[in-house]
């Protein structure tokens, strides 16, 4: 069954106009939540029904103009050099994976892996993305911005810092508070233009733009860094049924800036896979501890965010080589935790008994319950 998102009349959740989804649930198998049932809603058609669901991915490509303190232009940071590489990445182009008998896209391969036990041999169940560049915009970024603190005090903080990556590209560290303002405005503008839609994935793609938090005690130096992407949704509370626009931010990542293979489209693949598994951000999970933490650590989460458990590991990336402009290019999408990892069971009914995919060795066992 193929769906044309442009003609889709709405999602499958009562009271919402959004993407098509399917529902399920799992029971926690260890820890203080043993036996508790955790419902979920995921992107696409139910695996037991089969068929192929295709969602348009509306892409607004954002370039940056960075200003000096006096308002003159310091430099511009264009997205254009990364457009072709992004559109030809494993997020949108097919490659071979063990979870599919035919070449498919990266997030679809991961989703098929976690529901492999449900599929009949050769069953054509896929959730696919069709990229569409709907706009190319420029955002002007001032050198400083005024921030009102919780106590009412107003301080001036640096908005951005720049550097040069190994490939010669400019990278930008941007204050997250200011970025959130820019991102929200951009999404709302695209919604008002009709470019971002409720039955699609909607992406604001940035060039080497990494977010840092405010350093209150030293506002002219960056705080904690770096956020490379996130996924969320926008909604209109005045309309019934309520429209929800799935909205993603992801940065292109030039090589050499981060470890663990964090480069090119890793952030984009992370956010797309999490949008597949938790599109509306309300999929809970038993409290799980981040891998690699000491046994008594309470560095934990309690949601079905499949990229987060892996992003902290040294082997987060899964290299995939595709041809771009008749030349091989090796991409680095991120390995993902499978649904079975969050179940905290001793075994997994995912493909090959795996807890992660495509590299099944990244997470050799299920999640450890968060210490109480």
Where are these regions (language model features)?
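Compositional signature of intrinsically disordered, low-complexity segments enriched in polar residues
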Residues: 1-48, 57, 159-190, 194-198, ...
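Low-complexity, serine/threonine/proline-enriched polar segments
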Residues: 82-166
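Metalloprotease/metallohydrolase-associated module, dominated by Zn2+-dependent proteases
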Residues: 216-258, 262, 278-372
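Intrinsic-disorder/low-complexity loop/linker signature
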Residues: 50, 71-72, 123, 136, ...
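Active-site-proximal segment of zinc-dependent metalloprotease catalytic domains
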Residues: 173, 177-271, 275
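Structural alpha-beta junctions
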Residues: 69, 74, 87, 92, ...
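N-terminal module-boundary/linker segments of secreted carbohydrate-active enzymes
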Residues: 1-102, 331-372
